[in-house]
């Protein structure tokens, strides 16, 4: 799913970039199974690139730079649809994954149970 640059710009003006580094929270969810795959941060540029290219982009809080999810691994996340929360400070992207999402090689970043950590 892609929006025009004009549509993306209008939508971005309605968002509230209030989190660290002027970001919103971005949740990736499998578009078929609805499994939560990962959570990241997006600044205005990341949202714009995501909406206009159809490929998920994030803002790296640690590296302070934009990154295309899958640019190194080839495991791109293709946007099928998206939703915006009631406050406008978070988005859920329903995605089609090209390979595992997590850098560990797991399909989802949410693969650990609490018992694994205690």
UniProtKB/Swiss-Prot annotation:
GO function term, MF aspect, one: magnesium ion binding
Cofactor details (free text): Binds 1 Mg(2+) ion per subunit. Binds 1 zinc ion per subunit.
Keywords assigned by UniProt, alphabetized: Amino-acid biosynthesis, Cytoplasm, Histidine biosynthesis, Hydrolase, Magnesium, Metal-binding, Zinc
Pathway(s) where this gene product acts: Amino-acid biosynthesis; L-histidine biosynthesis; L-histidine from 5-phospho-alpha-D-ribose 1-diphosphate: step 3/9
Class of this enzyme: hydrolase
GO term, biological process aspect, one: L-histidine biosynthetic process
Ligand binding (Zn(2+)): 86, 102, 109
First-listed, main subcellular location of the protein, grouped into a coarse class: cytoplasm
EC number from the UniProt entry: 3.5.4.19
Cofactor: Mg(2+); Zn(2+)
Location(s), subcellular: Cytoplasm
Highest rank taxon of the organism: Archaea
Keyword Magnesium in record: yes
Entry binding sites for Mg(2+): 85, 87, 89
Catalysed reaction equations from the record: 1-(5-phospho-beta-D-ribosyl)-5'-AMP + H2O = 1-(5-phospho-beta-D-ribosyl)-5-[(5-phospho-beta-D-ribosylamino)methylideneamino]imidazole-4-carboxamide
InterPro entries named in the record: PRA-CH, PRib_AMP_CycHydrolase_dom, PRib_AMP_CycHydrolase_sf
GO cellular component: cytoplasm
Subunit structure: Homodimer.
Family: Belongs to the PRA-CH family.
Purpose of the protein: Catalyzes the hydrolysis of the adenine ring of phosphoribosyl-AMP.
PANTHER family: HISTIDINE BIOSYNTHESIS BIFUNCTIONAL PROTEIN, HISTIDINE BIOSYNTHESIS BIFUNCTIONAL PROTEIN HIS7
Record protein name field: Phosphoribosyl-AMP cyclohydrolase
